[in-house]
Curated annotation (Swiss-Prot):
The keyword Membrane does not apply. Transmembrane segments: none annotated. Gene3D superfamilies: 3.30.70.330. It comes from Sulfolobus acidocaldarius (strain ATCC 33909 / DSM 639 / JCM 8929 / NBRC 15157 / NCIMB 11770). Pfam families: Ribosomal_L23. Part of the 50S ribosomal subunit. Contacts protein L29. This is Large ribosomal subunit protein uL23. GO terms for molecular function: rRNA binding; structural constituent of ribosome. Keywords: Ribonucleoprotein, Ribosomal protein, RNA-binding, rRNA-binding. It comes from the Archaea. Belongs to the universal ribosomal protein uL23 family. NCBIfam families: PRK14548.1 (NF011118), uL23_arch (TIGR03636). GO terms for cellular component: ribonucleoprotein complex; ribosome.
Length: 82
């Protein structure tokens, strides 16, 4: 599985509300294209862009910005984050 978990930290919730962005921990060898396909398939949304980074713990974190016509808060509600 590509997606390990969705983060619901204070910063992640702020990004959902202000920038329409989901914060996801993914497998380290996953590409941006794989992340995009998985998110679009699971939640029936369109992804605008993805930024990734490797945390000091060695986890890969992806910031997934959704297109304007879709709401990250709707996805977060489906997941029970908000």
């Amino acid at each position: 599985m590509i997606i390990k978990e969705f983060l619901a930290t204070e910063k992640a919730v702020k990004l959902i509300e202000s920038q329409n962005t989901l914060t996801i921990i993914v497998n380290r060898n996953t590409t941006k294209k794989d992340i995009k396909n998985e998110v679009e398939k699971l939640f029936s949304v369109k992804v605008e862009k993805i930024n990734t980074l490797i945390t000091p713990k060695g986890e890969k974190k992806a910031y997934v910005k959704l297109k304007q016509e879709y709401k990250a808060s709707d996805v977060a509600h489906k997941l029970g984050m908000l």
